[in-house]
UniProtKB/Swiss-Prot annotation:
<dbReference type="InterPro" id="IPR050257">
    <property type="entry name" value="eL8/uL1-like"/>
</dbReference>
<keyword id="KW-0690">Ribosome biogenesis</keyword>
<keyword id="KW-0694">RNA-binding</keyword>
<keyword id="KW-0698">rRNA processing</keyword>
<dbReference type="GO" id="GO:0005730">
    <property type="term" value="C:nucleolus"/>
</dbReference>
<dbReference type="GO" id="GO:0003723">
    <property type="term" value="F:RNA binding"/>
</dbReference>
<comment type="similarity">
    <text>Belongs to the eukaryotic ribosomal protein eL8 family.</text>
</comment>
<dbReference type="InterPro" id="IPR002415">
    <property type="entry name" value="H/ACA_rnp_Nhp2-like"/>
</dbReference>
<dbReference type="InterPro" id="IPR004038">
    <property type="entry name" value="Ribosomal_eL8/eL30/eS12/Gad45"/>
</dbReference>
<dbReference type="GO" id="GO:0005732">
    <property type="term" value="C:sno(s)RNA-containing ribonucleoprotein complex"/>
</dbReference>
<dbReference type="Pfam" id="PF01248">
    <property type="entry name" value="Ribosomal_L7Ae"/>
</dbReference>
<dbReference type="GO" id="GO:0031118">
    <property type="term" value="P:rRNA pseudouridine synthesis"/>
</dbReference>
<keyword id="KW-0539">Nucleus</keyword>
<dbReference type="InterPro" id="IPR004037">
    <property type="entry name" value="Ribosomal_eL8-like_CS"/>
</dbReference>
<keyword id="KW-0687">Ribonucleoprotein</keyword>
<dbReference type="GO" id="GO:0007004">
    <property type="term" value="P:telomere maintenance via telomerase"/>
</dbReference>
<comment type="function">
    <text>Required for ribosome biogenesis. Part of a complex which catalyzes pseudouridylation of rRNA. This involves the isomerization of uridine such that the ribose is subsequently attached to C5, instead of the normal N1. Pseudouridine ('psi') residues may serve to stabilize the conformation of rRNAs.</text>
</comment>
Length: 149
């Protein structure tokens, strides 16, 4: 007697994604400057293009290390990360070194944009000539956001 194998379905069940407005309810108090709906979408697209070139730094520890080494780029942080002590020092580091940063509403969407099944709370997008136009557009928009102080 053998066990019957379960048929593996090739279709991945889609999780119902929440709208931008629904995600805003989960933001933590330090999530400023928050990217708007259009800028969030642009940042996710830029992350997807950067991941193809392997031109991205993901995670608090890695981003912190490369900011300290003087690497330049755009820092994108998830606004729904708790506890905030995990990454509350990153904006100060960015401001000291003149690196533009922005918050997006969802860490799971940020992780998905980076090609990961796991949520990601901090990403550093480095410039590259293959997606320079999208990068420059995002850089301009992130620098135009008002700083929280």
């Amino acid at each position: 007697m053998t066990k019957a194998k379960k048929e593996e379905s090739e279709e991945v069940p889609e999780t119902p994604s929440k709208s931008y407005d629904e995600l805003l309810a989960y933001l933590n108090p330090i999530a400023k400057p928050l990217a708007g709906r259009k800028l969030t979408k642009k940042l996710y697209k830029c992350v997807k293009k950067a991941i193809k070139q392997k031109n991205i730094r993901r995670g608090v520890k890695e981003v912190q290390k490369f900011i300290n080494k003087g690497e330049k780029g755009i820092v994108v942080m998830a606004g729904d990360t708790l506890p905030i002590e995990v990454y509350c020092h990153i904006p100060v580091m960015c401001e000291d070194r003149g690196i533009p940063y922005s918050y997006v509403p969802s860490k799971s969407d940020l992780g998905a944009a980076a090609g990961s099944k796991r949520p990601t709370c901090v990403i550093l997008i480095k410039p590259h000539e293959d997606y320079q136009e999208a990068y420059d557009e995002c850089l301009e928009d992130v620098q135009a956001l008002p700083l929280p102080y």
